Curated annotation (Swiss-Prot):
Belongs to the eukaryotic ribosomal protein eS19 family. This is Small ribosomal subunit protein eS19A. It holds the Pfam family Ribosomal_S19e. The keyword Ribosomal protein applies. GO terms for cellular component: cytosolic ribosome; cytosolic small ribosomal subunit. One of its GO terms (molecular function) is structural constituent of ribosome. SUPFAM superfamilies: Winged helix' DNA-binding domain (SSF46785). InterPro entries: Ribosomal_eS19, Ribosomal_eS19_CS, WH-like_DNA-bd_sf, WH_DNA-bd_sf. It comes from Drosophila melanogaster.
Length: 156
């Protein structure tokens, strides 16, 4: 089905599939310190998932597909959260800009993202092609799974 895009299907499935694609192709170079770094100053620990960098890059790609261009500042705002201050009130806190910057640089090095003349980064034509191709694969897998199960028969 040629008309299927990323906007037409479940976003969690897109993010998971793109993360698997990024890891399998080997286009994305993960920085050395990303296995021990925290994703934000309001977090207590580093992520448990060893592939969190691929998932974060996939999420950034999906975000750039919908709303482009976006820079490091907007990415840190998206992944921000609540900083708990003990007995004091909680406040919003941005995510770590180092992780966002390294993710955007890795995507740019893989030629999935390119710099926008007005600032920030936008999805390149190669990145959009890959995301649409992955969306088509997800739809075909869902259709094949529906064909395998067949019609639902209710007996009395």
């Amino acid at each position: 089905m040629p008309g299927v895009t990323v906007k037409d299907i479940d976003q969690h499935a897109v993010t998971k599939a793109v993360a698997v694609f990024l890891k399998k192709t080997g286009k994305l170079k993960v920085p050395d310190q990303m296995d021990i770094v925290k994703t934000a100053k309001f977090k207590e620990l580093a992520p448990y998932d060893p592939d969190w960098f691929y998932v974060r890059c996939a999420s950034i790609l999906r975000h750039l597909y919908h709303r482009s261009p976006a820079g490091v500042g907007s990415i840190t705002k998206i992944y921000g959260g609540r900083k708990r201050n003990g007995v004091h009130p909680s406040h919003f806190c941005r995510a770590a800009d180092g992780a966002a910057r390294k993710a955007l640089q890795a995507l740019e090095h893989a030629r999935l993202v390119e710099k926008h003349p007005d600032g920030g980064r936008k999805l390149s034509s190669i990145g959009q092609r890959d995301l649409d191709r992955i969306a088509n694969q997800i739809v075909f897998k869902q259709r094949d799974a529906a064909k395998q199960t067949g019609p639902i028969v209710i007996s009395k």
